[in-house]
């Protein structure tokens, strides 16, 4: 109710993973009409360069801003001045939330974590050598070349404004130091709880359920029945054509398609 009174649209529930943590879903759409004022404020406070950002920048930035507003509201309504609050922001897409809290609620400790860098993804995704030639890349020139000036600006600004700056590996730490001009404070490796993967007893049931869903999707896309014993191959993940191996996957599918000995 308090959030709604403040113009924040949220849904609260439980995340269906181990521990069932509380999750707040944030609707950023109410801030779209205020985007110019929001980005102007960030320029005045941090020199965040949003002027060339398109909607693939605007929407994530507004989501981050909305998340920052929700955190601010939650802290004001649910915590005391004696409590120590930490907010962790992952990737440039949430960086605007960190910047908002730094000015609106500086008592909240802000951690910024990158899993790669904007420029690193661009370089690797365009078949250019990343680590062997990194020292020769000028970040500002790369940002202009790949039209990611605003994304790079938000990532770099968040890294510099964070109370603690982290990344997930030593190799991405070298990216951060060069492209963001900021050494990380800590390397925090990715990790997965054992419960994230099904037990041996559950595996077959989940495999069957997944296959049934695949068949439903295939039939909906093709507009015709698909045989129950059809060979199904799938890929998932962030849409980065080369970085995530989608090009290799398509080439492999092409080779299989030309193989007359498969029997499928």
Regions found by a protein language model. Give the residues of each.
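Catalytic cores of nucleotide-sugar-dependent glycosyltransferases that transfer UDP/GDP/TDP-activated
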Residues: 1-264
């Amino acid at each position: 109710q308090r959030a709604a009174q403040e113009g924040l649209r949220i849904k609260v529930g439980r995340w269906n993973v181990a521990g069932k943590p509380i999750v707040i879903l944030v609707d950023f759409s109410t801030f779209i009409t205020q985007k110019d004022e929001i980005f102007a404020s960030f320029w005045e406070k941090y020199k965040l360069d949003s002027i060339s950002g398109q909607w693939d920048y605007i929407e994530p930035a507004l989501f981050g801003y909305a998340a920052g507003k929700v955190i601010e509201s939650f802290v004001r309504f649910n915590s005391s001045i004696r409590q120590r609050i930490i907010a962790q922001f992952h990737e440039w897409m949430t960086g605007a939330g960190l910047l908002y809290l730094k000015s609106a609620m500086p008592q909240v400790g802000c951690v910024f974590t990158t899993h790669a860098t904007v420029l690193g993804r661009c370089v690797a995704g365009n078949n250019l050598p990343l680590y062997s030639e990194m020292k020769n890349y000028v970040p500002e020139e790369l940002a202009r070349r790949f039209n990611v000036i605003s994304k790079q600006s938000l990532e770099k600004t968040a890294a510099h404004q964070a109370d603690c700056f982290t990344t997930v590996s030593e190799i991405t730490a070298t990216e951060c130091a060069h492209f963001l001009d900021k050494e990380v404070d800590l390397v925090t490796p990715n990790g997965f709880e054992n419960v994230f993967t099904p037990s041996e007893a559950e595996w077959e049931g989940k495999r069957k359920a997944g296959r049934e869903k695949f068949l439903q999707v295939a039939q909906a896309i093709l507009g015709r029945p698909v045989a129950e014993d059809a060979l199904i191959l799938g890929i998932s993940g962030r849409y980065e054509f080369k970085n995530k191996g989608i090009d290799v996957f398509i080439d492999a599918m092409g080779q299989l398609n030309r193989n007359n000995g498969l029997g499928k």
